[in-house]
Amino acid sequence: MQRAPFQARIDGCRGDKSFNDAAAAGLDKAKKVLKVTFREVSATAGGAASERETKLRLLAQAGYNPVIAVGFLYADAVKVVAAEFPSTKFAIIDDASIALPNVASLVFAEEQGSFLAGVAAAKASKSGKIGYIGGVRIPLLLKFEAGFVAGVKATK
């Protein structure tokens, strides 16, 4: 059985020691363990939504299937491009707003992992002072914060 091309989309670039690196590690493992082939492309960090849309469209036109968008910032682009390519499967990580039959939403219970991080921080703190930096105030990171705070409070 010949495998279809596999496409992954990474927003930003490798080297952020966070979300994008975790996605890239998953791609690397899939390439090694599952023997899938993929093409990795990125839009300019902080670039226009139209650039994300163009990149996704080019991948779909090239026959990559599935096309995976990493991050909620791709929601608008995935919605537009997936509608144009109904035979192509799309997936988006950290967004569940797209109601199209060819789009899979890959979402997580962020507050559960951050709850455990809050517990670990509370147990490790010698001063009783604990901080959390979420970067930006968006619903996704507010869920992280709520889980972290709940974990800290549950430990006291």
Stretches found by the model and what they are:
Residues 49-63:
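Short, well-structured alpha-helical segments in soluble
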Residues 1, 6-33, 39-52, 72-74, ...:
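Extracytoplasmic "Venus flytrap"
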Residues 76-83, 89, 108-123:
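Active-site-adjacent structural elements in enzyme catalytic domains
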Residues 27, 115-156:
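An alpha-beta-alpha
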Residues 63-71, 91-93:
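Periplasmic-binding protein-like
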Residues 83-107:
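Flexible loop/hinge segments that line or gate small-molecule binding clefts
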Residues 28, 32-35, 61-64, 79, ...:
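Sec-exported extracytoplasmic/periplasmic mature domains
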